[in-house]
């Protein structure tokens, strides 16, 4: 790696904000001999451009000895982030490769067949006459030979040990704050009827699993049964599409189970495993790793010589290194200052009550009233509501419909989230999007969104066995940092440029928790807007204020992708004051406007 090239490799024609100073500090960190540089850069600092400059410093083929790695990887956990890279003309020299399922076969009669189900995957010994033109293998060949290959973190991890994507000189991971959590997710083994092929599940059902010894014994039996079924499938000359999927899943399952058993028996492994089987014998078993440093070494740290990890929310260097299996002595942290004026990214104290499960009946209606008032304050501007869970989102939609503003509200389910988000972003109206788990990798610059509500402090779910185990081990710092990290990520969705102005409105009364308890880990640019200005009061507007007139360019208004405008409130969008709604009209969020 030649860090001195970092300025020349910066892809933009000029610097913005603190980019030039950031590159200087990154160069100094690598020149000081650090193998890993953490770059804590806030939203709007141009992390992708910084990442490209770092990747460009990788050793080149003409400069290397035969045994030395060359080139760079750029990887990110978020598919949408990779899409943004693909669409950015400043990053067009990154060669992007995606998984096989993202490409269609080009053989006659197979144009709607994903490559992972094409004849080359179905037929033994199939010799594809157009492999040189296959979109997947073409992209893979180009990416493997170009100086910077770009891919999702999932694809990057799956190709560990690959002859095609071997070790490179530099690895750049964007949105790297959740690296350990992503590794835990990828390394989790779900032994359920939906994940274990039926032929194996029915012949080898789970016994009662009470601890790791039982889990290991079952894993070995299941791996043996899976291997027998895989041998049967491989003996066939041609497979049906369903059998192709079964074969691939069995191959993956055998590898996962083998990794678990091997790691568990490795006396030097630092990974702790937990096992869940809440419903007893014959039901699903989930095997989860905690702090899977060994898994990360195989899938990430062995893939490069130098690493740059970029994120706005790497809050504690020591904790990040501990969770990721890094030696803090080999790691430098570079802080990039925020250059957006703090008055343009305020965080208002608009808490309405506790959002814990036992208090939700009282608090959700209050949060809905807050949303209606904010809709009235922003009659011509889009808003985003982070509901934290689908259950909360559903209840919010019910209350917003009951308040008569449902025609301005959109939502989604687990299947429609991408389509619903895309439709909302494209719309030119002022609809409000009630979302679940969209705190990361969203770019809502400009009129795409002007205000947002955080319904609940996003603490990790204590019913998750990994979370419970960490809290039992007194890892409360991790717990509060996780919530703070999610809040910071959410705030970064809506203020994307210095001229933007967005307000963020936490609604759950536990909001001070992550800010106060994780304050020592809070960057200054995060602490600055955490001031308690008075919540905006209800506007002195008419009853139509929250609907804001023409609020959507779709014929169905809020009934666009994920919308439900046919539910709840009246067709006019007004609160039904005839008595058909059981709520007292005086308790309606716009009752002060009507004078009732």
Labelled PLM ranges:
Residues 2-11, 15, 21-26, 30-43, ...:
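Conserved coupling segment at the C-terminus of the helicase ATP-binding
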Residues 33-40, 50-91:
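Conserved SF1/SF2 helicase motif Ia
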Residues 137-147, 404-433:
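Conserved motor-coupling elements within RecA-like helicase/translocase cores
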Residues 127-169, 434-439:
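Conserved RecA-like ASCE ATPase "motif II neighborhood" in helicase/translocase motors
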Residues 72-76, 149-152, 172-173, 306-311, ...:
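Structural recognition of the conserved hydrophobic beta-strand(s) that form the central parallel beta-sheet
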Residues 459-488, 497-596:
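Helicase C-terminal subdomain and adjacent C-terminal extension
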Residues 98-103, 153-155, 387-391, 408-422, ...:
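Conserved helicase motor
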Residues 351-360, 416-511:
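Conserved RecA-like P-loop NTPase helicase motor core
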